[in-house]
Amino acid sequence: YIDAGGRLDRGGRTELAMQCSVYTRTGIERIARAAFEAATERGRLVHNVTKSNVLSYGATFWDEVVKEVAAEYPDVRLEKLYVDAANLSIVSQPERYDVVVAPNLFSDILTDAAAGVVGGLGLAPSANLNPDADVPGMFEPVHGTAPDIAGEGIANPLATVLSAALLFEDLGESDAADVLRSAVETQLG
């Protein structure tokens, strides 16, 4: 997210607010390549999720660049979805999905919905990876921390443990990742 936009006539009858989204070819190509690389090792399907039917500049540009990158991966299928339809089907047909590429706002929406399928945010790990690998990734539960429930003894730490498993996997320590996943499975019964 970026802080581009503004508000005019605060509190007035003609109050106006505008929030801009910024997409760069470099950024889109980078995340799209990471998605297609992941798909070559997995199910060979990438879902591209935007709202280009109404966001005719940024989202359309995103779709065009993802399609260009897809041409570099002829063995990987690309399926385009609008975020509203994807949000419904990620809950009703989660088995359809393996690799999803989407702008940050839509990804945030989809990860919340997908977390509900697996038992909630307390069970949803995430990895923010740098495809260039010149800086380390960040591994945390989907949407990070929950400061609103700090100290109440009700936070579920399992997403943190599963995020650590993703970290170990990224480091090439698959045995350690398996131990953590097994421990979570044991806890869940």
Where do the protein language model's features map onto the residues?
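Short acidic, glycine/serine/threonine-rich loops at helix termini
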Residues: 2-7, 57-61, 90-93, 113-114
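A generic local structural motif
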Residues: 85-89
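Short amphipathic alpha-helical segments, especially helix-boundary/capping motifs
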Residues: 8-13, 40-44, 137-142, 158-160
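A glycine- and small-aliphatic-rich helix-loop capping segment at beta-alpha/alpha-beta transitions
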Residues: 6-11, 64-69, 118-127, 131
